[in-house]
Amino acid sequence: MSWQTYVDDHLMCDIEGHEDHRLTAAAIVGHDGSVWAQSATFPQFRPEEMNGIMTDFNEPGHLAPTGLHLGGTKYMVIQGEAGAVIRGKKGSGGITIKKTGQALVFGIYEEPVTPGQCNMVVERLGDYLLEQGL
């Protein structure tokens, strides 16, 4: 299965039980910042933004004072799982990032999708990739 198929079929899909509710944007990005696959709507990010995200996974709390930036959008960092999941909020939307052995799985959402639904979609794929050694 191609990486793009994972994004299209497992991240940008309808949320279970909620037809037409789906993430706004999604991507799978290598730890080095290389894009493996992304939705057409995923923002163009700067290398320093990806460096900040990777630093926060290695040093939890790094982004808390400045916020998480992706594609020029600033998200307030909210409760995540140290070294495994970063979550951010901006207005009625937000972002979930799950770290796997080789990649970061990104999901960006806006209402009516809820933070919990975004977390479920992103973390389910991230957990699957971890189980596959990726």
UniProtKB/Swiss-Prot annotation:
- Write down the InterPro entries for this protein, in alphabetical order: PFN (IPR048278), PFN_euk (IPR005455), PFN_sf (IPR036140), Profilin_CS (IPR027310)
Phosphothreonine occurs at which residues? 114
Spell out the subcellular localization from the entry: Cytoplasm, Cytoskeleton
**Motif Involved in PIP2 interaction in this chain:** 84-100
Q: What is this protein called?
A: Profilin-5
Q: What is the lineage of its organism?
A: Eukaryota, Viridiplantae, Streptophyta, Embryophyta, Tracheophyta
Q: What else is known?
A: The variability of the residues taking part of IgE-binding epitopes might be responsible of the difference in cross-reactivity among olive pollen cultivars, and between distantly related pollen species, leading to a variable range of allergy reactions among atopic patients.
Q: Which organism is it from?
A: Olea europaea (Common olive)
- Recorded family membership: Belongs to the profilin family.
| One of the record's GO molecular function terms | actin monomer binding
Q: What does the UniProt PTM comment say about this protein? A: Phosphorylated by MAP kinases.
**Function recorded in the entry:** Binds to actin and affects the structure of the cytoskeleton. At high concentrations, profilin prevents the polymerization of actin, whereas it enhances it at low concentrations.
| Quaternary organization | Occurs in many kinds of cells as a complex with monomeric actin in a 1:1 ratio.
Q: Which keywords describe this protein according to UniProt?
A: Actin-binding, Allergen, Cytoplasm, Cytoskeleton, Disulfide bond, Phosphoprotein
- Gene3D superfamilies, per database record: Dynein light chain 2a, cytoplasmic
GO cellular component terms listed in the entry, alphabetical order: cell cortex; cytoskeleton
Which CDD domains does this one have? PROF
Q: Which PANTHER family match?
A: PROFILIN, PROFILIN-5
Q: List the disulfide bonds.
A: 13-118
- The protein's superkingdom reads Eukaryota
